Amino acid sequence: MPDLLIELRSEEIPARMQRKAAGDLKKLVTDALVEAGLTYEGAREYWTPRRLALDIRGLTARSADLREERKGPRIDANEKAIEGFLRAAGLSSLSEAHVHNDPKKGDFYVAHIVKPGREAEEIIADVMPAIIRDFPWPKSMRSGAASAKPGSLRWVRPLQSIVCTFGAEHDETKVIPFEVDGIVASNITYGHRFHAPEAITVRRFADYAEKLEKAKVVIDAERRKEIISADAHNVAFANGLELVEDEGLLEEVAGLVEWPRVLMGSFEESYLEIPSEIIRLTIKTNQKCFVTRKPGAETLSNRFILVSNIEAKDGGKEIAHGNGKVVRARLSDAAHFWKRDQSDLPDLETLTASAEKFGLDLKKPLDQRMAKLDALNVTFHAKLGTQGERVARIRSLAAALARLTGADAASVDRAVVLAKADLRTEAVGEFPELQGIMGHKYAVLQGEAAAVADAIEDHYKPQGPSDRVPTDPVSATVALADKLDTLVGFWAIDEKPTGSKDPYALRRAALGVIRLILEGSARLPLLPCFDVALAALKAQRPDIRAEISADLLAFFHDRLKVYLRDLGARYDLIDAVLAPDADDLLMIARRVEALTAFITAEEGRNLLTGTKRATQILAAEEKKGTEVAESVDEALFRLDAERTLHASIKVASDDARDAIVKEDFRSAMQALSKLRAPVDDFFNDVLVNDEDKAIRANRLALLGLIRSATGEVADFSKISG
């Protein structure tokens, strides 16, 4: 079967756009071909800084014929209706139509229409111009002489050539003829811009990839990453160093070069006095280079790894030297703002009011920055006030949380008032990724307690499912207060996540709260926390929306389900223990854990069967309006199975309740498991729907006791199986 090769070659595509663009090309082309009636065996996308490529294997050479039956008017219809039918069906006379009999409606004309399939080449030539013209670039531009015309092509960077070849493996390939804004599809591409700029004639993908490789272009981005990683490790090792891994930078650099050549540069050791985080970000952000260190060391070396797109005649010495000069200049700037952040601000007399508000010491640089942050009224959000107001809210909430977490109240308060101070430092102004990290470093330099300094850095954590969770009580308390203030605030102004949109990362904040509570084994009822946070917000914004707790708690329940499901818990078991007002996340998680262990054991499965039968019968009768006694009357028992079940429920309920009070959910489940035999005997020996209404109502009340007893632990009706 034929294969299809497409290449769209342009000026340099931004690295951050390449992977998605190649995926978009694959989806758009394959979707269009399938919609047109073609099928294929496989497709893979490729990309470099200057090209998007698509290799489609086993594409059918022609789409199948389509057969359609079009129903017409009755055979005794008027002439006008029949003429309209013939015209619509493309028939020249009634002799080409068929007559179908309908026993109820009589005889009808029917047209059997055959739409012949189309050649794949025709389909490809038809769909490709529209795909290219409507390509979903985040940003695009017009270029060249055609750009002055209305509707001219927009591409991320000027599009220079199109390759489109089609043919079976052992046959000569054909060029699919189409053009876009004067760019005509061909079988001609070009190699490396400097090393091999000559035209290359290609047939199919294997030939294309091989010829590009000879022309100093590695078409496979994953292979470029492997080359860069392996060579970088080898160069570092050869110099007695190890590479500091950075997957994001590796992805980016692989999108900057077509022919990766790894080199090593250096800078003066005096710059190593700057914090490693600043050095790493300076070199990464500005020069797209990797840093190195001595094997096993925490601190960096003065050597860095760069990736060139050129195979230089001097082995890359001049390139490495040039990069070193730029790195030194950048590090000189970094050293300057590192020192300035440790010096006094020039306008301390204007910061007195802010210092008094937060209990700050204006002799200390970080305190000065916090006072400056407040004095400048830096906006956090237009509807939620300034950063200073936010710190005041977090301070109030953190004080309440400290009483629940057992954290030292003074340390928590000090950490909160300094947590956002580094937002006014030059280091964070240059590298926003360092907020918290620089606050920690400056806090240590001015003599803050270790717990306070750690909390300043850790209060942003965890920032994702794999990020570290702070375990120190002070850090955890400040992190919880920060995230809960964010969530309550945005709920109060009704700016919640919708669909895939979550501009304020509120899902991540909720997951952070969940992980802090569960992984820190914290007993922290959420509803009172919401109330404290909301009260602090209303003190600043009296007109703020107040009724948010139920909706915000439901949001937490949804995120908790996702978190527990990722850990292997079943959704139905989570639902079974999750009451609408359940705000103790640790207790919910422990109940799910106990229920999972119980329900997967034989005794649990058997009890589930009996309990669900009881609740289903009771629910059905309640729906029909059947009378159910308010309480069980032992005098109405007629069989031993009733008496035994009633006594067993009382014992099991008491034991389960005692265990729940102690939060021993496994023991509560085991207590309920003793109902298995009495429930089985009851359903074997007793007819619930007795003819006597009083006996029936009493037996239904007994089923109600089963539902109530098991409901202390979970809603068994929600458990599948």
Swiss-Prot record:
Keywords: Aminoacyl-tRNA synthetase, ATP-binding, Cytoplasm, Ligase, Nucleotide-binding, Protein biosynthesis
Main location as per UniProt: cytoplasm
SUPFAM superfamilies: HD-domain/PDEase-like
Top-rank taxon: Bacteria
EC number(s) given by UniProt: 6.1.1.14
GO cellular component, one term: cytosol
Keyword Manganese assigned: no
Localization in the cell: Cytoplasm
Reaction catalyzed: tRNA(Gly) + glycine + ATP = glycyl-tRNA(Gly) + AMP + diphosphate
Keyword ATP-binding belongs to the record: yes
InterPro entries: DALR_anticod-bd, Gly-tRNA-synth_bsu, Gly-tRNA-synth_heterodimer
One Gene Ontology term from the biological process aspect of the record: glycyl-tRNA aminoacylation
Pfam family, one: tRNA_synt_2f
Protein family per UniProt: Belongs to the class-II aminoacyl-tRNA synthetase family.
Subunit and partners: Tetramer of two alpha and two beta subunits.
Protein name: Glycine--tRNA ligase beta subunit
